[in-house]
A protein has these predicted regions:
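Charged docking surfaces used in two-component/phosphorelay signaling
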Residues: 67, 157-336
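N-terminal Rossmann-like NAD(P) cofactor-binding subdomain of oxidoreductases
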Residues: 1-190, 226, 259, 290-291, ...
Length: 336
């Protein structure tokens, strides 16, 4: 089994290396690819040093079985044919192919079997906020069909990249030192602030990030569920959180929800508010599971349930989800 990582020097690329090593992914060889800026860098994996190769239009993927790509939508579109033409499975972390009808959009806890049918040889990894939410929604959907979802996301600085996280830390330092605040990676100062905008605004008034949650949730869950999101950038460093309201066909009790979520794969129940136990980014950063708590009946809707979740958007929201897809393909004998 030969594995490639495209975008190996980025935050998600580095997380791929950690996740693959931690999970003892069954592979015989590894090749790393990057831009001119990162080509030549060296990284250690399982005690062996690997040098990043320059990504080019050639036959470098001829012997690759699985390629994890995380270098942006433009690169994914440009190199998709080079990556897949000899039979490699491309598991793409960008937005390039998520809504392509010939590309499955997969969260293994929800729709792993969709990964087995991939006409273009590509499997898309959903947006991080979508992944985190549907992992929690799936066990509730099995109790009663979800008709409507309202989400407010609270997304950390690192969701905008490593440079954005560094800028937030710099902003705090500049404020303390009485210096002018540097604002380059965000629309406004993020330190001591929240920004109700992630990505660009669309004609309907929603942002691109918010529309991703609408479209991707429906595709993953094979559902016509109505879904409305408000995505907000907050001044935590790593791990996203979401406040979620759902309306189901029949009422789901708090006890039913807790029991289903406690048994669900990829979910950790942290729901004891009387003792100040609930999910927070400080505890979920670096963890694989999505943590859920504050589960309660919606007092405005007898068929409503509301809860709070938090998870590491770089792990389950990106690298881990992609690796789990690959593990499912191997287990299913669906890789050459």
């Amino acid at each position: 089994m030969k594995v490639a990582i495209v975008g190996a020097s980025g935050a998600v690329g580095q997380e791929f290396l950690r996740v693959l090593e931690e999970r003892k992914f069954p592979m015989d060889d590894l090749v790393l690819f990057g831009s001119e800026r990162s080509a030549g860098r060296k990284y250690t994996f399982n005690g062996k040093e690997y040098e990043v190769k320059l990504l080019q239009h050639n036959d470098d993927f001829k012997d690759v079985d699985i390629a994890f790509t995380s270098a942006g939508a433009g690169i994914s579109k440009e190199f998709a044919e080079d990556i897949t033409k000899y039979g490699a499975v491309m598991i793409d972390n960008s937005s390039a192919f998520r809504m392509d009808e010939n590309v499955p959009l997969v969260v293994p806890e929800c729709n792993a079997e969709d990964a087995l049918e991939r006409p273009r040889g590509i499997i898309a990894n959903p947006n991080c906020t979508t992944i985190m939410m549907v992992v929690v929604l799936q066990p509730l959907e099995q109790i009663s069909h979800i008709r409507r979802i309202h989400i407010a996301s609270y997304q950390s600085a690192s969701g905008a990249g490593a440079a954005a996280m560094a800028e937030l830390q710099q902003q705090y330092a500049e404020i303390i030192e009485g210096k002018p605040v540097t604002v380059k990676k965000f629309p406004h100062q993020l330190a001591y602030n929240v920004i109700p905008q992630i990505d660009v605004f669309q004609p309907n008034g929603y942002t691109k990030e918010e529309m991703k949650m609408f479209n991707e949730t429906r595709k993953i869950m094979h559902s016509d569920v109505k879904c409305s999101a408000m995505c907000v950038r907050v001044s935590s460093l790593r791990a996203h959180s979401e406040s979620v309201w759902i309306e189901t066909e029949r009422p789901i009790s708090v006890e039913e929800a807790q029991k289903a979520l406690a048994a669900a794969p990829g979910v950790t129940l942290r729901d004891d508010p009387a003792n100040l136990v609930y999910p927070m980014p400080l505890e979920t950063a670096g963890k694989d599971d999505i943590y859920v708590g504050r589960i309660r009946k919606d007092i405005a809707d007898e068929n409503g349930l509301t809860f709070w979740l938090s998870g590491d958007q770089i792990r389950k929201g990106a690298a881990l989800n992609a690796v789990q897809i690959a593990e499912y393909l191997i287990k299913s004998g669906n890789v050459r």
